[in-house]
Each structure stands twice: as structure tokens, then as C-alpha cells.
Amino acid sequence: MKVPQYVTVEEVKRVCKELKISDWTKKKAPKVSPREAKVVLSVVNKEKMKIDLKDFCEGLQVELEHGMTFKDANVTNNHPVLTGLIVLAHFKESLDYYKLLEVAELEGDLVKAVARGNAEKIKNYYKRLADARITLNQAELKRIGK
């Protein structure tokens, strides 16, 4: 079965224009400015969840990266509202979702480096993983009021 393009480039352009943000169909890198993240958050966050703008911006960038890296799995075609809804859904699971994801991805990268016997990458990934775990632990402690 040929999977159709459910979200057209024209629709993404139209929405970007309506939101008064840059044209996300022209993105070469998964970067989102805080101003654009704020616009998207204001559209998708109907229940007024307490979501940190920096975290939302990072979530948008992660989801855009996934779509740009795995083009055959880019379900939103970089549509800002749909991408924002994916981020929102993840935050409904856990406000630390992207911090948890960073730890999981680095653990996977570390395993690959160990399997290849690449000492330099092992050291690099281990340090980044330790930093990501600290960031996650600090966020969790803040969330529980410690």
C-alpha cells in the first residue's frame, strides 16, 4: 500500500502564515525560536497545562529532528500545530518526557559504542549520560518539591 501524504506542504505553509511564524517547510535544521514555540504552545495548550517554554521548545525540536531524520516517518510534515500536539501529548504523560528520552537515547548510544569498542565514544556518551541523568534527577526533585 502506498501511504498518502496526509499533511500537504501547502497546508503547512498556510498554517505558518496564519500563525505569523517562519515557513516550517523550509527548515533545514530542527531549530525553533522561543517566540515561535510560544505561539505554537498558545494554540495547542487549551487546558493551560503548566509547561515550561524552554522544555516545549526543546520538545518541538526533538519531534522536528525525528521527522527530518526519518523522512518516511514524518507524520506531521513539520506542521507546527500537529508537531506541537505531539509534544503536548508527551508532556501529558510526563513533564519530564524529553529529559527521560534524552537519557534513553544516550543509553542506547552508549551500548552501541561499547559494542563497537570505541573508547573515545564510550567516554563521551558516558559523560553526556551522567549529565542528562543529573538534569533529569534535578527536574524530578523540583517537581516533587525537594
Residue spans for each PLM region:
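Amphipathic alpha-helical packing elements
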Residues: 74-109
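Long amphipathic alpha-helices with heptad-repeat character
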Residues: 110-111, 122-139, 143
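Charged, low-complexity interaction regions
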Residues: 24-25, 48-50, 71-76
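Intrinsically disordered, low-structural-confidence terminal and linker regions
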Residues: 1-21
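Short linear, low-complexity motifs centered on an aromatic residue
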Residues: 101-124
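Histidine-centered active-site/metal-ligand motif
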Residues: 17, 63-66, 89-90
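Charge-rich, solvent-exposed alpha-helical interaction surfaces
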Residues: 11-18, 39, 43, 125-128
